[in-house]
Curated annotation (Swiss-Prot):
Pfam families: TMP-TENI (PF02581). Belongs to the thiamine-phosphate synthase family. InterPro entries: Aldolase_TIM, ThiamineP_synth_sf, ThiamineP_synth_TenI, TMP_synthase. Keywords: Magnesium, Metal-binding, Thiamine biosynthesis, Transferase. Its EC number is 2.5.1.3. This is Thiamine-phosphate synthase. Pathway: Cofactor biosynthesis; thiamine diphosphate biosynthesis; thiamine phosphate from 4-amino-2-methyl-5-diphosphomethylpyrimidine and 4-methyl-5-(2-phosphoethyl)-thiazole: step 1/1. Mg(2+) binds at D76, D95. 2-[(2R,5Z)-2-carboxy-4-methylthiazol-5(2H)-ylidene]ethyl phosphate binds at T140, A141, S142, G170, I190, S191. The gene is thiE. GO terms for biological process: thiamine biosynthetic process; thiamine diphosphate biosynthetic process. Condenses 4-methyl-5-(beta-hydroxyethyl)thiazole monophosphate (THZ-P) and 2-methyl-4-amino-5-hydroxymethyl pyrimidine pyrophosphate (HMP-PP) to form thiamine monophosphate (TMP). It catalyses: 2-[(2R,5Z)-2-carboxy-4-methylthiazol-5(2H)-ylidene]ethyl phosphate + 4-amino-2-methyl-5-(diphosphooxymethyl)pyrimidine + 2 H(+) = thiamine phosphate + CO2 + diphosphate; 2-(2-carboxy-4-methylthiazol-5-yl)ethyl phosphate + 4-amino-2-methyl-5-(diphosphooxymethyl)pyrimidine + 2 H(+) = thiamine phosphate + CO2 + diphosphate; 4-methyl-5-(2-phosphooxyethyl)-thiazole + 4-amino-2-methyl-5-(diphosphooxymethyl)pyrimidine + H(+) = thiamine phosphate + diphosphate. NCBIfam families: thiE.
Length: 211
């Protein structure tokens, strides 16, 4: 079971794997290369993968993360996260409600919640979430239709909660410092790492920006 301070350390560079944005690099290799560059957390995210395939992929990524003492989070699917013995799950506002997930989750299981405003952040904290994913901050290729949260709202959310806030959405080496200065304890990225030719180098460049 990780403490809140340990969790903050584990959430500093949160890399989300993506089959489509990974330029043909297998998910396992994406994880290995990102971790080699300093990723502290890995999330498996796939909106199209069937349950069985998602579970099999989760087992593979869990082993990579366990070998490297890196946090492993499954996106959306609590059933897959629990079956694969992941460290936790990340739930969006339209996914399984937090209170329902808490009933099923074992002690020490990490639950992250997406938040785009202060109200959502406060509800997540009250409901027992462990961290917040805040964004879409700058706009991103993985969610082209997402409404932008912006840096000002990110700052308001970070100030409104004691939960660790991880900024997400269009974050790269050029703007990472902006979200960290706004109060985020870490950054979550997809294309800024897994879409790059040098995944390890891209992760390393970002990790060096995070205190």
């Amino acid at each position: 079971m990780v403490t809140k301070e340990q969790l903050k350390e584990k959430l500093k560079l949160y890399v989300i794997l993506d089959r489509k944005l990974g330029n043909g690099v297998p998910l396992r290799q994406q994880a290995q290369l990102a971790i080699a560059g300093g990723a502290t957390a890995i999330q498996l995210r796939d909106k199209e993968m069937k349950g069985r395939d998602y579970y099999q992929a989760a087992l593979v990524i869990k082993d990579v993360c366990k070998e490297n003492n890196v946090l492993f989070i499954v996106n959306d699917r609590l059933d897959v996260a629990l079956a694969a013995e992941a460290d936790g799950v990340h739930l969006g506002q339209e996914d399984l409600p937090l209170h329902a997930a808490k009933k099923l989750a074992p002690p020490g299981f990490i639950i992250g919640i997406s938040a785009v405003n202060v109200e959502q952040a406060k509800l997540a904290e009250k409901g027992g979430a462990d961290y917040l994913g805040v964004g879409d901050v700058f706009g991103t290729a993985s969610k082209p239709d997402a409404k932008l949260t912006g840096v000002d709202m990110l700052k308001m959310i970070c100030q409104s909660t004691s939960l660790p806030c991880v900024a997400i959405g269009g974050i790269n080496v050029n703007n990472a410092k902006i979200v960290l200065d706004a109060g985020a304890i870490g950054i979550a990225v997809i294309s800024a790492v897994v879409s790059q030719k040098d995944i390890t180098g891209a992760a390393k460049a970002l990790r060096e920006l995070i205190p």
